[in-house]
Every structure is written in C-alpha cells, then in structure tokens.
Amino acid sequence: EIVLTQSPAITAASLGQKVTITCSASSSVSYMHWYQQKSGTSPKPWIYEISKLASGVPARFSGSGSGTSYSLTISSMEAEDAAIYYCQQWNYPLITFGGGTKLEIKR
C-alpha cells in the first residue's frame, strides 16, 4: 500500500498570500489527484492527473509534481479557499488518501 503524507497538517494564510500544500508518497506514483472539502459537505474533485483543474476550479489553483513528490498551490489566497485539501492516488487495486491539510484564513 502506498502511503501519502501531507504537509502541513494545518496552515493559515492571509488573503492574497501564496499557499503551497505538499503530498509525499511512500513509493512512486504516476498520477496524483486533489480534493477540496468544506465543512458539512463531501470532498469535491479539485485537481486531477497532477495538474488538470476540475470544472469550476479557479485558475489561481495549480498542481505539479512527479514520482513521490506532489504539490497543490494557490497563487493568491481568497476567503473561499479555506477548506481541507486531500491528495489521492490510485495504485490498482488500492485507492489511498493523504491525511488532509486544513487551510484557514489568517486574520
């Protein structure tokens, strides 16, 4: 089983600040996907196949990486970006998720 470790577990960013969330895999993976979850809702697909934005995702989001190291970046934090973000990989037949990164607004 491939283990995904996200860093940081919790972070706070000011509006307009650049934010980077990392996801480290215990073994090399071909693709990494990211989900966004807001309180009381199910996780939504956010970035798929490393860098492709899901429908409706703002262009300030981007994804990158290869091998065992991947990241999600927000170029300029907005209030609506406060959420929990999860990385996810599929190594047949197992799907694994990272532990999540809670992103809050720094006030």
Swiss-Prot record:
Residues 49-55 are annotated as: Complementarity-determining-2. InterPro entries: Ig-like_dom (IPR007110), Ig-like_dom_sf (IPR036179), Ig-like_fold (IPR013783), Ig_sub (IPR003599), Ig_V-set (IPR013106), IgV_Light_Chain (IPR050150). Pfam families: V-set. It comes from the Eukaryota. The keyword Disulfide bond applies. GO terms for cellular component: immunoglobulin complex. Residues 88-96 are annotated as: Complementarity-determining-3. Disulfide bonds join C23-C87. Keywords: Adaptive immunity, Disulfide bond, Immunity, Immunoglobulin. Residues 34-48 are annotated as: Framework-2. Residues 1-23 are annotated as: Framework-1. The keyword Ribosomal protein does not apply. SUPFAM superfamilies: Immunoglobulin. Residues 56-87 are annotated as: Framework-3. Residues 24-33 are annotated as: Complementarity-determining-1. This is Ig kappa chain V-VI region SAPC 10.
